[in-house]
Amino acid sequence: EKGSGAVFFSGCALHCVFCQNENIANGTAGKVISTERLGEIFLELQEKGANNINLVTPGQFVPQIIKAVELARNQNLKIPIVYNTSSYENVDTIRSLEGIVDIYLPDFKYWNAALSAKYSHAPDYPSVAKKAIEEMVRQTGAAVFENGEDSLMKCGTIVRHLILPGCTKDSKAVLRYLHETYGNQIYISIMHQFTPLSNVEKYPELNRKITEREYEDVVDFAVDIGIENGFIQEGETAEESFIPEFDNEGV
């Protein structure tokens, strides 16, 4: 109740070496369901008091999702649809979601193509993500809230950036681009919960949490360049206990 109604989809277009949800990203977790059942799940989450429907890594199931949302809306689904994505998506896919998605929650992971090639096997990630986010912002425009900025978002785009160990220069380039391109049209979430798991052992430079100094350096930069609509994190979040188990609950 009073939380995000997360619906995780199996599979991911990216193959990040530091993936926190590897069992679902590589398609080994999950359950096959019908479009009709997906629509029912959306309605069940609304009935339980969810504030929104949060579609996590949904890109490969967009046609089915569109049908499921339409079915659910015909049965009184009212809460916002959130599209939670790595941004490694075809622009035509995003365009097809106009009128379906209310809130976009994209990542902008890398500015430097060498980093995206090394850590996500996607040298074209920066250019693909730019185009995808541009289409998302075109659709939503500036954020709209229920009752002012302290209330729930009804429509808008929140771009997330996870700082990687030793990559503050790249993080600053991402933030500068987003601010210079979109200004206060978007919200930016600067995240520090990078959690080194066994999958980064071949990448010793990633085999640590980011330091408090690294995070503060990036946040200070965001303030200095004039970012006003932003979210920052406080406290310790880089723990394996924060990574969800996927047991098909609710499916």
Task: Give short role names for the model-derived ranges.
Residues 68-80, 131-139, 212-220:
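Alpha-helix-loop-beta-strand connector modules within alpha/beta enzyme cores
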Residues 1-103, 112-114:
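Conserved Radical SAM active-site core
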